[in-house]
Structures are given as C-alpha cells and as structure tokens.
Curated annotation (Swiss-Prot):
The protein, known as: GTPase Obg
Enzyme Commission number(s) of this protein: 3.6.5.-
Species annotation: Picosynechococcus sp. (strain ATCC 27264 / PCC 7002 / PR-6) (Agmenellum quadruplicatum)
Disulfide bonds: none
Domain OBG-type G: 160-328
Sorted UniProt keywords: Cytoplasm, GTP-binding, Hydrolase, Magnesium, Metal-binding, Nucleotide-binding
Amino acid sequence: MQFIDHAEIEVIAGKGGDGIVAFRREKYVPAGGPAGGNGGWGGSVIFRAEENLQTLLDFRYARTFKAQDGERGGPNNCTGASGEDLIVDVPCGTVIYDRETDEEIGDLVFHGQIFCVAKGGKGGLGNKHFLSNKNRAPEYALPGLEGEIKQLRLELKLLAEVGIIGLPNAGKSTLISALSAARPKIGAYPFTTLIPNLGVVKRPTGDGTVFADIPGLIEGAHQGVGLGHEFLRHIERTKVLVHLVDLNAEDPIKNYETIQGELEAYGRGLPELPQIIALNKLDAGDHEFADFITEELRRLTDAKILTISAVSRTGLEQLLQEIWDVLDYLKEISRNEAPETSVMDLESLHIADE
C-alpha cells in the first residue's frame, strides 16, 4: 500500500432544514393557530481515529466530504429530521490544520477518538415560534442555517515510541529489520528507504514497542533538502531517539554533528528528546577506531554511546536494554502527569434548541 502522510480536503457540514408556515385546521380547533415545525439540524462532519489505518491514501482520491442536510419542519409542530452525521475514519496520529489560518485545530491520537471538524447548521424556526399576543397568526418562518465549510490540511505523524535516525546508508533499515519483523527494502546506497518503516519489538514482558526508521535526514533536511522535511515530523511523537552513526563513514563525528544540527534547526522538541548513540557496522570496522570515536563523541554529548553491528546483531541486546530503561524511566516520571481523557458522545455535538 502506498504511504501518504499528508492531504488537503474540503469538508461541508449539512444545512439546517427550513422552518415552515402551517396552521391547525382540525374541526375541533376552531381558532386554529400556527403549527409550523422547526427544521432539523444539518449533519456534522466528524473525524474518528482508526488504529487499522496506516496512511492518508484514501484522501488523495476523495477530497470533498459532505454531511447530510436537515429536513424541513412539518405541520402540527413537527420538527424535521436532523441530517445524518458523516463519520470519516483517519489513522491514529492524524493532525488537522485549518488551511486558511494554518492553525492546528485537532490531533487524533487514540483509537476511537473523535473530533468534529465542521458543525451542521441549525434548523430554521417554524411560524409557531413567532406566536405572540400581538401576532396570533404569524405567516413567516426562518430558513435553516448553512453548515460550516472548511478547507483542511491533514498530516499524519507516526505513533512510534522509538525513532531511529541517522544519515542515509547508516544502517537504519537493517537495524529495524534485525530488531523486529519489519522487512524494509535494504541496499548499499543512499536513500534506499523512501518512506518511514515501522516495526514492533517485543519486550521481555511481552509488550510490543513500536520503532520507526526515519529516512531522508541529510544536511538541510529541516529546510526540505532531500526527504527530511517530509519525515522529521514523524519523530515528534517519539519518546527516545536511537542515533545511528556509521563507523565506516569518512567522518563519523561530522555525520553525528550534521544530524544534531538538523534536529536543532527543526526544533519542536526534537533536540530535547533522550538519545542513545549507536555506532554501527562494528563487524566491518576497526575496534580501536570505534573506541576513538566513542571518546570523541563523549566530548560532545552526555548521551549513552554503544557500539553495535546490525548485520551480525552484535550489541543489540544491550541496545534494547538501554531503550527499555529510558522508556521505563520516562513512564515512571509521567505516570502522575497524564491528562484525563474522556470519550465524546456523538450526540453531544448537537446543541438542543432552546
């Protein structure tokens, strides 16, 4: 399936039904009286997070989403039926922006979480509403209000706890393949990976942790050079970064500094994320040189530094243990800081007529 992580769409909520002019004409009600009902609410457009969706591909083919209009009022003070809400499923991790203001208006993270992106119009008032002492037989009613129309931009930010970063050909895809059941395309040339790859790594407790191999980080990535600007946002939600450095590269220290510079330039919390530096390709490198690079890096960072080989799986157990330790520590300090969440009732999106 093609991986699409951004889309632009239009959403149109339903128009409220018109109120009507009607009068009672029963034989046993000689005085008659206004009896025109109100129009029903227009349907709203509601996004719902769905854990089984992994891409915004569907939004490349359907770009306009319209909810049902409300029905007009009926005689005998009958309110028209409300239009049916349009429920649109999106992947968990979808961020919703208003294209006209560039404002973030919604962020759907949890399965089943919903967000109303366009509210249906209120139904118009029937002539019964305008009955007064001065006007006993009003012959006018109000039309329903138009529903909201919005131009939206959708961005998918992957929900992975661990992000694997590094320059092209550092061995990121090989590492995620060695750690999980993911089978990304692997090759000995830059930009083999053109989309983020996800893999689930089992912990000793049996729980699964999602790892993401982020492609395309080169110098200037934060400005859109290479593929970086498209994919840097996918590590915004990660809790820890594994920074892979190729020991066989011409200048591993410079490569490390390049990626760190891109994280600093991009911002949005990425420089503050905990990091574990993994010096990769130890199987093809010089152990003394690896020790030298380790000491040089210790002058630049306080992050944990390990030497590994994704190909021979050397050092991977230690790497995983370091990752689990960081995640456990973060979980412990945030246990009492998690915000309360609640499930919104779809019916609560409509305000009752007063």
